[in-house]
Each structure stands twice: as C-alpha cells, then as structure tokens.
Amino acid sequence: METPRLMCTQHPDSTVKVPVQEEVEEAVRSFLVYGCDEVMSDYEGKLTPYAQPKEIVVKAGELGVPVGEGFYVTVRAPNPRLEDFDRVDLALEAAVLANYYSYKRLGVQAVRWVVLPMTDSAETVRLVQRLLARKTRVLCEEVGQPCEQAQLVPLLEDVDSLLRVREILRDLHSALAELGSDPGVLRVFLGKSDSALKAGHIASALSLLYALGESAKAGEELGLEVKPILGGGSPPFRGGVNNPRLVGVEVQRYRGYSTVTVQSAVRYDASFSEYQEVRSKLLGGAGGEPGDAGGRVAELARLAASMYRSLASKYLDFVNEYARSVPTTRDRVSWREYGRALELEDKLFSAPRAIVYTAAWYSLGVPPTFLDADFVLEAYRGDFLDEVLGYLPGLEEEWRYDAQFYLPRLAGERLGEELVKKVDEALDAMGLRPEPLEPYEKLARTAPAELRALLLGKVRGFLG
C-alpha cells in the first residue's frame, strides 16, 4: 500500500466560507477535481458532524472513487488533554463507523489513519491508540468485519515536540507493539502553523528541518519506514507550501516529506491554473531525502523561539482585539473557547488559533514573519546570519514576499514605533526594502473593521 501524497484539509485559511453541510461534497471534489489522494475529516476544535467520515466514504464510493485503494479518509480527533473526552470518543467512533461502511460497501478499509493533534506525551499516544484498537475489536467481533485497526498519527505542533520526534516515534511504535501490531510504516505529522505561533517562523522552520531528518533516523533505528506529513499553508509564517509564489523554495527547504497538506486557501483563493502548478511542485518534492539538519539547528531554534516570544508577547492584547474581527470560514469552536497560549518564562499569554493570529497581524500591518526581527538583528550583529540563511534557503525570498504587505506607518499608529524600528532594521540587515502594494495599504486604512481582514486576505490570496 502506497502512502498518500496530497492531503486536502478543512483549514479555515481561505476567504471563502465552507459550511460544514458542504464538506462531504467538498471531500469528493478534493478527490476528483483537486487530485488529493487523502482527505481529512477534522474534529479538532470544530463542529464536524459525527457521521461525516462515513458520508464521505459512501458518497465517494457512489461516484466511483476507489476509497481504501489509493484514496483515503483520515480523521483528526481532538486531544483528550485539551477537549472534552466525549468529543474524542465520538471522533474515534466516527472513524470506526466509516470503516464498517467501507467494508460493507467496498470491501476495503477507508480510514487507515487517525491524527492526534498537539501530541507531546507518550501517555496520550497510548491512551488514544488503545481506545481505537478496542473500538475496532468490538465491531469486528460483533459484526464480523476485518480487525485491521487504524494507526495513530502523532501531530507535533511545537518546537519542543518537533525536536523530540524520535522519542515520540519510539513511543508510538511501542504502543502499537503492546497491541500486537507490527507496522512496516509509521506516519508522523509535522505542523508548521502552531509551532510558528508559539515560537516564531525561524524557530519553527529550523525545528521542522530537524524533525524531518530525525524521522528518517528513527525509521532506521526501528527497522521500518517513517513517512512524514508536512503540515503547512499559504503564508510564509505557516509554511508557504501552498503559496504559488513560494512553493518552489519551500519544497526544496522541507525535503524529506512524504505527504503534504493542501489547505483551503490554495483551492479557493488561487486560480485553478495556479493550484495545478502548486500541486505539481508539491508532488515533485514528495519522497525526497531530508537535508542535513545537524550543526547548531536545535540551538538556533531555541534562541530564535525565546527572542520571538519576548517580542510577540508585548503585542498580544492588540492582536487579540483585532482577532475579533477576523471572520470564521469554517464551523469551528470559537478561538476564545479553544485558543492557544504563548509561553514566556513562567507566564502563559492567551492567543488566537494560528490562522486567526496570522490574519490579525497582517491586519495590523506587520506580517508575523517579521516578529523574528530581534533574532535576525542578533544574528546579523553576531555574524551568524549567513549560517541561518544556509539552514533556511528561501528565507530572504519569504521576507521579500511579505515586505509587500508590511505597512510601517499603519503599524506605527496601531502598535507603536518601537516594533516598526526593529522590523525596519531587520529588513535592512536582510538587504530588503519594503514596497507596500498601494491598493493593499488603502484597504487596510479605509475598509470597515468587520470586512478588513477578509478584503486584505483576498488581495494576499489567503486569510491567514
């Protein structure tokens, strides 16, 4: 069985609203029109119907999609540490139920993987994998369907977890062995967005490079294949892998992924010809050997994370205020109920989820990529900026891309001149001169607050 290469997701990063009632049809279009061989049915912080995975399987099967044979439905379940246990239980039940119907109608297993977000402990991995195995066993014993259990896919979404990927893969392998399973392949999901929110763009990018290399080493150690899923979106801060302007440099940087996410913005805010070009480059980059992420990668990631948190935490009150006007383009639980936290020393600062956070920073006139300004200046003055650029080819191109959305006068009015001065100095250190798009700056100043984030997103080609 081949591992899927393109995973279409339900991320709310587009300016086009997709209500939950349309997501089954959307999943089928993802197979037939967008050429994804895997679709994610997402329950994390989201109001997804219990029967959605089953309905995708049934509808796709009716339209001739060979679900379970080259095309798969993957469920993202909530993490029981972060959401109510009944939501976790029902999401796992939904995955098992979808397989019941896929066996009954098509004779194959459609849901082979269940993603566990925010994975950071062996205990949670073991708990969820055990629950999944027991639910599968009960159904197969009672109705006679095959007892192939879906495999847990840990989603690592912070710098610390990404740097510990080998340890987490050992724990997953051990948990599967305890349940009598001996897989030849493990998948691990490496997330760019939340790790960037918590630690900044540079730290998350460095950690991702490290995790891709360590995943390959873990496979050698365990005597199996590890197939990483690269999770990223359109803005540089969230990975840039779906961005028509940046996808070429991103697939070179993040070599070693087997699967990559295709999020909503590139499907709905880009032209279809642009989408096809992105898809082609993503497929061309899949399955390559990871680059060398040795040297000081982990050390630099931790330093960059610390400096980003010190800077970003000063402005979170402004970000949280502007986040209220960012529209919701999926039926998700409000970020005020299910948000994120930015940790600085012994304090936790409340923040929106990554897409809303990203959109809010753009609305304030500062692309969140530039929140690494202190680190860039430290690297420049300490004469190790070239070392950082060597690890992160394309960083200059990302900053050049985001410079067109940097509005220093507006940012100075809303956030103060101190941040603007730092960003200007960092851009100068990178050899870049910002040239804001004129219509973009005009919209940022004159659009009504409730429409501003959406209209700016339409110009950029992504909400956040």
Curated annotation (Swiss-Prot):
Enzyme Commission code(s) on record: 4.1.1.31
Record's protein name: Phosphoenolpyruvate carboxylase
Complexes and interactors: Homotetramer.
One matching Pfam family: PEPcase_2
Reaction(s) catalysed (UniProt annotation): oxaloacetate + phosphate = phosphoenolpyruvate + hydrogencarbonate
Root EC class: lyase
General function of this protein: Catalyzes the irreversible beta-carboxylation of phosphoenolpyruvate (PEP) to form oxaloacetate (OAA), a four-carbon dicarboxylic acid source for the tricarboxylic acid cycle.
Keyword field contains Magnesium: yes
Keywords recorded for this protein, A-Z: Carbon dioxide fixation, Lyase, Magnesium
GO MF entry, a single one: phosphoenolpyruvate carboxylase activity
Necessary cofactors: Mg(2+)
Name of encoding gene: ppcA
NCBIfam families in UniProt: PEPCase_arch
Family statement: Belongs to the PEPCase type 2 family.
